[in-house]
Amino acid sequence: MAGKARVHELAKELGVTSKELLATLKEQGEFVKSASSTVEAPVARRLRESFPSAKSADSAARPAAKPGAPAPSTPATSAKPGGPRPGPKPAAPAPAAPAAAAPAATPAAQAPAPAAPAASTATPAAPASNAPKPGRPTPAAPAPAAPAAPAAPAAASTPAAPSTGAKPGGPRPGPKPPRVGNNPYSSAPAERPAPRPAPGAPRPGAPRPAPGQGGPRPAPGQGGPRPAPGQGGPRPAPGQGGPRPAPGQGGPRPSPGSMPPRPNPGAMPARSARPAPGGRPGRPGGAPGGRPGGGGGGYRGGGAPGAGAGAPGGGAPAGGFRGRPGGGGRPGQRGAAAGAFGRPGGAPRRGRKSKRQKRQEYDSMQAPAVGGVRLPRGNGETIRLARGASLSDFAEKIDANPAALVQALFNLGEMVTATQSVNDETLELLGGEMNYVVQVVSPEDEDRELLDSFDLTYGEDEGGEEDLESRPPVVTVMGHVDHGKTRLLDTIRKANVREGEAGGITQHIGAYQVLTELDGNERLVTFIDTPGHEAFTAMRARGAKATDLAILVVAADDGVMPQTVEAINHAQAADVPIVVAVNKIDKEGANPDKIRQQLTEYGLVAEEYGGDTMFVDISAKQGTNIDALLEAVLLTADAALDLRANPDMDAQGVAIEAHLDRGRGPVATVLIQRGTLRVGDSIVAGDAYGRVRRMVDEHGDDVLEAMPSRPVQVVGFTSVPGAGDNLLVVDEDRIARQIADRRNARKRNALAAKSRKRISLEDLDSALKETSQLNLILKGDNSGTVEALEEALHGIEIDDEVQLRVIDRGVGGVTETNVNLAAASNAIIIGFNVRAEGKATELANREGVDIRYYSVIYQAIDEVEKALKGMLKPIYEEVELGKAEIRAMFRSSKVGNIAGCLVTSGTIRRNAKARLLRDNTVVAETVTISSLKREKEDAVEVREGYECGLTLTYSDIKVGDVIEAYELREKPRD
């Protein structure tokens, strides 16, 4: 075949389909694209050797030569037609070692492969005990040549194994001509196959074999039993196996174009069923022209795979063990060339996968399978996820498919989408199923990591001790509602703030700075006023965190109240010193000593009782002992606190409260904790950012810079920051915007995870039923009030039949956008200390949106609670109307059975519910009185002592039965 062979041409030549041939090529490590692709000559040769149909003409034994055919050119024994088969000629006396040493098996690494055929055939097969072990070379020590001579009579006595005798001293016969179509060196006619070439002839289409690769590998078990060591005949010294032909003696190597075409396997002569004479020595009945050491007729050599025979009866070694260079291959064939067009060595087996395929399949295996979904398997690694993370975030951390996590959660009873925020418990449950430890990062840690990504820190003073300067103390006034906190601040500031508060209660945090004297020195003190109402728990906690010292105001006539205890807990949790101000000592019934005793239970022991807490009896209304209270505050601050900060660094602080001003936009009351805030600084507070355009103090005066412990109102935010958010100065607006955006996204995810109602598969039926839901939109004058109102509304205890959902919240007046959202979602708008803007009222009237305005927080809570209870399904209770006894029975073809009754108690009404009793046993539970007559006249009701006739929706009635009528009335909820 000229040039490279194509796959489909090889398939046609080998008698197989192209698909099978492509599969074989893939098993051998040769990857071709299609049947039209070409393959290299060594690959094509391996393919021809791999298919039995192609090897039947190459390696199978042939029958004897046909009558009339020309004899081979070599002086071999030929079979005469019609005559008896000649017996073996007795070997002539072989005088020298060359004749006896030629048939001896030589090691694969030393003996030349093309042994002399005449000398090989002259030596008959050795006895079974002397046969060499396959794959094992004989000892290298040369043995005397005598054992080879007496072996001739033994072989001659076997008529079934004729052999050609060697003539001593005569010329060696030349190599036999190769078969047509297999050897390109052949010049014989193509119409008749020629015998197999002798070992000395070069292999067609392949380089000259190296020493030790002369013959094909015999099949296992066909070479006879193995001889004991040392019985396989003498091992010749190097160079005694006959001269090696010179490179020019084999004829010129033809080009691929001059090679004759390979005959079709179907046109080759069939194998003979019986052994032909002239077979290989070592097994009777070999094919003519067989190689020394071969098996019987039609079989391969008797050596083990990958090893050569070692004694008479075994062929030359053909390569090493499998898997080694020069070894492997199919049994009886030469070893594969190491690294040539595929894997070196190694026998290609059909149906086996390569190591690469096995490795790829192993790497793609994933476990465990949760609910039929394959998930990655962890080794107890810790996965850090933000609060409110989605399954997509989780999948990105563990390199998994989000859809698989969704399916796994569905099988675990949770229905979520890939981008939906998931609560902490669900994430931990899913992580445990995959052997991961899910660690939900706290908001503080997440914010710290966010600032670290921008090389920012919060909460630490820069520089050393020499950079720190003293600052005023920050004092928070805490206590129960109506105990006089704001009046105390008014007395200290000599102002009147309380009258401006709705309902006389504080609903904001106010920050003020007061100048006072201590030992003749003027000292500044910053005061923060916190609400005392129960709804403002978060604001009190925020005030405790932003302060240095707390004044606990307790009314002497009221005692310790729930919000007093809560304020103590907030201050102790923030590790803040407490000074107790016992207020209202001027009122009747005031008992300051009782207050001291009650507070002892909470760890506040007065100094006069041996403790370390300072108690001051004051009257905020009369202004009694106010100076003593300020002195106690300053003394406690100087003794217990290190009030120093670095004023030269970028400002850091906390937003105490924030609101939306109609003319100025978002305004935040900020307490500077360290550094100095200046006009023009780029700032970020929570999810709000901006640039400081203006700063105003508590008196309304403009301030250019704010030092530590200075409360100011900051104008310039793009949105209203949350109360309690940390304020930070950054280098440029771009960084502030990026920090705010990421905080906003985190806040949204956490809020979505918190508000998502968990619905399991068991509750799916009931969840899909119509449920009552009250949607609210909250608008307030500042963010702290809106936050407190939302927390209070969510704290209303109500049945699961009704859900409360806050769909939007904000600071400022009610806008048209709020009205449109309320109209689309059937929501109610609650405005706290705000009113509708522009045409929002007209739009609300046109759309039918209800807007409620409140100025006191508990009024809003009470009305929302009533609305929620009104949305509940009514509760009915059963009320007995009366009883009637059946005295007679009448039958009618139109209405059925008619009962003549006497009303024994109460009243019997038409269409009322009833139950039928027989011998004080309920026969029918839900029966309706369908008709009622009195003296042949229809009646609506019949009272006690009167007779009546009635029909029931139950026909099995008897005389003596009792009819008990009742009705269901709605029961008011508590």
From Swiss-Prot:
Where does this protein chiefly localize?
Answer: cytoplasm
Q: What name does the UniProt record give this protein?
A: Translation initiation factor IF-2
Q: Where is this region: G5?
A: 619-621
Cystine pairs: none
Basic residues bias spans: 349-358
Q: Can you give the residue ranges of the tr-type G domain?
A: 470-641
Q: Where is the composition biased (Gly residues)?
A: 279-332
Spell out the Pro residues composition-biased ranges.
83-96, 134-147, 195-210, 253-266
Question: What is the annotated localization of this protein?
Answer: Cytoplasm
Where along this sequence does the record place binding of GTP? 479-486, 529-533, 583-586
